[in-house]
Amino acid sequence: MVLQKNWQSLIKPEKLEVEPGPVASRIATVVAEPLERGFGMTLGNALRRILLSSLQGAAVTAIQIDGVLHEFSAVPGVREDVTDIVLNVKQLALRMHGEGPKRMILTATGPGEVTAGQIQAGHDIEIMNPDLVICTLDDGVKLGMEFTVNMGKGYVAAAANRPEDAPIGLIPIDAIYSPVRRVSYKIEQTRVGQVTDYDKLLLTVETNGAVTPEDSLALAARILQDQLQLFINFDEPRPVQHEEPQDDLPFNRNLLRKVDELELSVRSANCLKNDNIVYIGDLVQKSEQEMLRTPNFGRKSLNEIKEVLTGMGLSLGMSVPAWPPENIEDLAKRLDETF
């Protein structure tokens, strides 16, 4: 019981609020509250670093241009030199299904701009920014390009993308795999009931469209969870369950007990009484935030109640079907002798 209090006594946000940005699929601010003081900075910094460095994505790793031997060449009839074309290709936002490497083909004839939407990507690759300009062709000029696309994470320099058996004319480029472009966070104060020094975490995430901000945050949280699992060197004690069916009740029969049987402190008992909470079944359906909004009900009272409920196999925020039963007083009297 004492071991569990290390994490069960801490307040946790019940849900995330998502505030969409100008382009909802690319920019959003995710708000989590309330958090224990200091946890906003702890979680915000960790999630930001993971979002920017560790998410898998797709990127072009090399290109070949018909008639071009190296990246310092100029292509006749193309207004941009190869270095500029490479810079434009780096901005391609891709979503790839399955493993790489994959190939994409581009053929175009001038005059006019050549955009990413003209690339033949195949069914395994989606181009998220088809309006991106790759280059500009003069009248009658034909251009042929081939792109190598792969999956990875973070940033990989061009030198690492050159295979040992690279053919003449293959131009490796820097690969920016991360689908997350920018992440910022800030911490604000928030209150729960009478307590005013909790943290509110606001994470603003911008992606390239290959993944939504909400999904990228979920992936980052899962990565963090997986990395921390190794540090847990104990088995969690399981709470004693008291859910033997009796009289075909669809809920734990402890819920029929009255809260004044819990031997709570005078302050806690009075707060429950003033809030018209009579049975444990009434109590467990309250969330932590709802309890803390009760007048004169503080963190100490909350921890006291959570500890008692845990020992009964119960917790705050439960959903109880068919509650309250119509004959609750009769059931409580009939089952009183079993407690």
Swiss-Prot record:
It comes from the Bacteria. Keywords: DNA-directed RNA polymerase, Nucleotidyltransferase, Transcription, Transferase. It catalyses: RNA(n) + a ribonucleoside 5'-triphosphate = RNA(n+1) + diphosphate. Its EC number is 2.7.7.6. GO terms for cellular component: cytoplasm; DNA-directed RNA polymerase complex. GO terms for biological process: DNA-templated transcription. The keyword Nucleotidyltransferase applies. It holds the Pfam family RNA_pol_A_bac. It is an enzyme of class 2 (transferase). Residues 1-235 are annotated as: Alpha N-terminal domain (alpha-NTD). Residues 251-339 are annotated as: Alpha C-terminal domain (alpha-CTD). Signal peptide: none annotated. GO terms for molecular function: DNA binding; DNA-directed RNA polymerase activity; protein dimerization activity. Homodimer. The RNAP catalytic core consists of 2 alpha, 1 beta, 1 beta' and 1 omega subunit. When a sigma factor is associated with the core the holoenzyme is formed, which can initiate transcription. The N-terminal domain is essential for RNAP assembly and basal transcription, whereas the C-terminal domain is involved in interaction with transcriptional regulators and with upstream promoter elements. DNA-dependent RNA polymerase catalyzes the transcription of DNA into RNA using the four ribonucleoside triphosphates as substrates. Belongs to the RNA polymerase alpha chain family. NCBIfam families: PRK05182.1-2, PRK05182.2-5, rpoA. HAMAP family: RNApol_bact_RpoA (MF_00059). This is DNA-directed RNA polymerase subunit alpha. It comes from Gluconobacter oxydans (strain 621H) (Gluconobacter suboxydans).
